[in-house]
Regions:
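Short N-terminal binding/cap micro-motifs at the start of the first secondary-structure element
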Residues: 12-19
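N-terminal small/polar loop signature for handling phosphorylated ligands or for N-terminal nucleophile
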Residues: 5, 19, 23-25, 29-72, ...
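A broadly used, surface-exposed interaction patch
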Residues: 59-87, 92
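Gly/His-enriched, cation/cofactor- and phosphate-binding structural elements
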Residues: 2-4, 48, 179-292
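Active-site metal-binding loops of divalent metal-dependent hydrolases
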Residues: 11, 37, 54-55, 77-78, ...
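Short alpha-helices
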Residues: 79-148
Length: 292
């Protein structure tokens, strides 16, 4: 393990996009370690310079890391983390950008325009879908492994007009395949009881964002769920439905998770835990949540 360490959000385009920015700047001078949300810090983090991108540890863990290491810098954009860490001077939050864009600015300065690759990542991560041909482009990006060489290739293709057209054609084919699979999975939708309320859900490790959003929108509920069993518990993605003002992160945080207003996640040991909070909340608030 090298003296410079980047810890970044594992199995996430935004997290890997953050790594890509740091690796372009520091190359082999830095160790790059993917970290799953909720997992403890890797062993051996002492006397290091540490950067944490696209996620945050709980406050107590961050303070221990700060005490044991030369420096620590957190670059994050998750609302639920900012609520508890914003007073720490080594934590930097900006809800208007994704982790990869924030990492780009950190590594390159605010005056250097982020590449299209990262702008598309942000469009998906913040659940905006405002970039042209976003679904086609992101279908291609999502089909590639997390590899520095492959992401350099993706970045190059998006900047070349001819290759961009090829990108769109490839994305259209991938979208057809994805939509077919999503329809097959969606047909198995059901409901789960969350704090006494029936919430539409789909059991799938694939296309969780799309499925959670779709079940909510078609059922007309405040939010929808997509989940899968990872061998240790049930991992949930939660997306807002037609009520765009509803803050799904408020639900996720009650199970020890977090995220954004429109897109969040959490994990429970058993499905019956969906009626039990991991964090203490006032009884009146729980009652209000059941009936609002």
């Amino acid at each position: 393990m090298k003296d410079k360490i980047l810890l970044y959000h594992k199995n996430c385009p935004d997290g890997y996009g953050s790594r890509w920015c740091f690796e372009r700047k520091w190359g082999d001078e830095m160790s790059y370690i993917p970290v799953a949300h909720g997992a403890p810090p890797p062993e051996g983090l002492e006397d290091k310079d540490i950067w944490i991108a696209d996620f945050s540890y709980p406050r107590d863990i961050l303070l221990v890391l700060k005490e044991k290491n030369r420096s620590i810098t957190v670059i994050d954009h998750h609302k639920t983390a900012e609520d508890t860490l914003k007073d720490l001077d080594f934590c930097h939050f900006d809800m208007s950008h994704c982790g990869a864009i924030l990492s780009w600015y950190y590594c390159n300065g605010l005056n250097k325009e982020p590449p299209l690759l990262l702008k598309y990542i942000e469009d998906q991560d913040l659940w905006k879908w405002q970039m042209p041909f976003a679904k086609e482009i992101l279908a291609v990006i999502d089909s590639y492994d997390y590899s520095f060489r492959l992401w350099e290739e993706l970045n190059y293709r998006l900047q070349d007009d001819q290759k961009f057209s090829e990108f769109l054609a490839e994305g259209s084919a991938l979208l057809r395949q994805r939509e077919k699979k999503i329809k097959e999975i969606y047909a198995k939708k059901h409901t789960l009881t969350v704090f006494g309320e029936e919430i539409p859900a789909v059991n799938s490790p694939l296309y969780q964002s799309e499925l959670a959003a779709r079940v909510a929108e078609e059922a007309g509920t405040k939010y929808g769920l997509a989940y899968y069993f990872d061998g240790d518990g049930y991992v949930f993605s939660i997306r807002c439905g037609k009520e765009k003002d509803f803050d799904v992160s408020a639900v996720a945080v009650k199970f020890g998770g977090g995220g954004h207003k429109a897109a969040s996640g959490f994990k429970v040991k058993n499905l019956k835990d969906l009626n039990e909070c991991k964090v203490e909340i006032p009884a009146a608030e729980r009652k209000n949540h059941q009936h609002d």
